[in-house]
Amino acid sequence: PVLTPLLALLLAREGLPVLLHGMRTEARRVLASDVLEALDIKALAAPETIANGQVAHIHTQHLHPGLARLLAVRQVVGLRNPGHSVVKLMNPCAGPAVVVTAYTHPEYLDMLHATFTSMGMTALLSRGLEGEVATDPRRTPRYDAFVAGQHRLLEEQQPGTAAEVPGLPTEIDVATTAEYTRQVLAGALPVPPALARQVEHILQLAAQIS
């Protein structure tokens, strides 16, 4: 299931303002925005100030119409283009912010490393699952941190895959994912340890720039 909304809400529970941005480029895919809507968190119609402890999400069109048009090309040709890499680097926030992003293919690690360094960005980079920034709950990936472009390896990838994550559903539909998210936030189900670790890394980075 898509766990990016859960990651965002766990961070908000710790007092951070959290913004998710993106758009649909595949017809059948469950998006983080779908799950957030099911949790009664409506999309922003335009950029606005996000309060501490708030999760907001916004369509790429409202941040950069040209980039949204480029991303939409995938629905025509069926392939990703450079816009999919650019959108993962976006920091649409005024003031200090941590960009949380991920790569799927290992060869992108060096490229993203060089980009964050040259642009002086503050970011957390890890290997994601199916294009999502939330970590695979069954594994602990490598984490690379960047503060004003300065790199630090936080954690190497841990070997092995968890045979089971308590309470994690096998279904990936919107309703099931939203209900799982509710149950974890309510304490009825445990936070997956891998996701809790990711939250810790983000909180530590945020503390360095606050």
Annotate each predicted stretch with a short phrase.
Residues 1-51, 56:
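A generic, well-ordered mixed alpha/beta core segment in the N-terminal half of proteins
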Residues 38-41, 49-210:
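Glycine-rich anion-binding loops and their surrounding alpha/beta cores
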